Amino acid sequence: MHTDISSFDPALAARLRAAVDSKTKPLGALGRLESLAVQIGLIQDTEAPVLIRPAMVVFAADHGVAQAGVSAYPQAVTAQMVLNFIAGGAAVNVFCRQHGFALEIVNAGVAMPLWSLGVPGLIDAPIGAGTRNFAHEPAMTAAERDRAMALGAQRVAAHAELGSNVIALGEMGIGNTASAACLMARLCDLPLAQCVGRGAGLDDAGLARKCAVLEAALAAHADARAPLDALACFGGFEIAAMAGAMLEAARRRMVILVDGFIASAAALVATRVAPEVQRFCVFAHLSDEHGHRALLAALGAEPLLQLSMRLGEGSGAVLAYPLVVSAVAFLREMATFASAGVSEQAPPALDPAA
């Protein structure tokens, strides 16, 4: 996979910051929107960025580790949710319709043979019928990992060829918070307790079981430390596809909207493979999943929203998009002090004794 990602232009960065500062407002008054506007301009290599055909790609896959009881839901829910996505009934469907996203659902490795159902509108490209149980063996082979990453890159390329310059990535996969927690623990060198959470709603006993399974798996695969080795050992086909998608999107200078905990774990892998990917990522929100705050801190990422969400699907990425739209709009359309004839000088302070 190509990782020839171009760098940002420091001269353009200076011009963008000057353009932001010239708007009719006190310096820094638009807060996070100001740095976001500069970031989007740098991604697109222009002082006048434009957002075109935002696209959401949801990758679905099953996880062998779900057999170890690390999720509150049965594995069959993955396929059921794929059918719900196709029917238009999930949260991500609603939000994509609301905010004008093209939505694509990709079977990256669901255990149920969805091809046999003849599901219309599904990109059916499974790497396998779910990963292996990494409590006992690596989740996937290096070849399977590479195929999953290539699948993600192919889907991004397809949307780029349709004109999209904004890509959001979502996922569905029972057991994938277990994969994300192990990737985080291994690649960030953090205690598992800081990384693992309740996922889709484990009770205390279920959480204790999940922690025990994952601790044993990390110990059993102590040699899987390089980013791509860890991805093959602990990842899911959908996580690998998202990592590959992010690498391709950065190569194409697209805005990458990163959703919650699972998507951030994919971003962790992608940025460890190619650190330049980070500059193209807009981290949408702070998830309520336990490990997400520490994962964002490890990535040096500042999320746009904090809504106590923990749904996945890419839902938070779509909800954050209007802020990206507003950042671009003020950069392009807001008057400058010069064009509006407004003084840039603050008035003199009043003498309280007068």
Swiss-Prot record:
Catalytic activity entry: 5,6-dimethylbenzimidazole + nicotinate beta-D-ribonucleotide = alpha-ribazole 5'-phosphate + nicotinate + H(+)
What InterPro entries does its record include? Nict_dMeBzImd_PRibTrfase, Nict_dMeBzImd_PRibTrfase_bact, Nict_dMeBzImd_PRibTrfase_N, Nict_dMeBzImd_PRibTrfase_sf
Identify its protein family. Belongs to the CobT family.
GO terms (molecular function) for this protein are: nicotinate-nucleotide-dimethylbenzimidazole phosphoribosyltransferase activity
Recorded hits in CDD domains, A to Z, give: DMB-PRT_CobT (cd02439)
Q: Which organism is it from?
A: Ralstonia nicotianae (strain ATCC BAA-1114 / GMI1000) (Ralstonia solanacearum)
* Summary of the function given for this chain in its UniProt record: Catalyzes the synthesis of alpha-ribazole-5'-phosphate from nicotinate mononucleotide (NAMN) and 5,6-dimethylbenzimidazole (DMB).
What's one Pfam family here? DBI_PRT
Q: Does the keyword RNA-binding apply?
A: no
Q: Pathway involvement?
A: Nucleoside biosynthesis; alpha-ribazole biosynthesis; alpha-ribazole from 5,6-dimethylbenzimidazole: step 1/2
Which positions are catalytic residues?
Answer: 313
Q: Which UniProt keywords apply?
A: Cobalamin biosynthesis, Glycosyltransferase, Transferase
Instruction: Mention one GO biological process in which this protein takes part, according to its record.
Output: cobalamin biosynthetic process
Q: What is this protein called?
A: Nicotinate-nucleotide--dimethylbenzimidazole phosphoribosyltransferase
Q: Which domain of life is it from?
A: Bacteria
Entry EC no(s): 2.4.2.21
Q: Does the keyword DNA-binding apply?
A: no
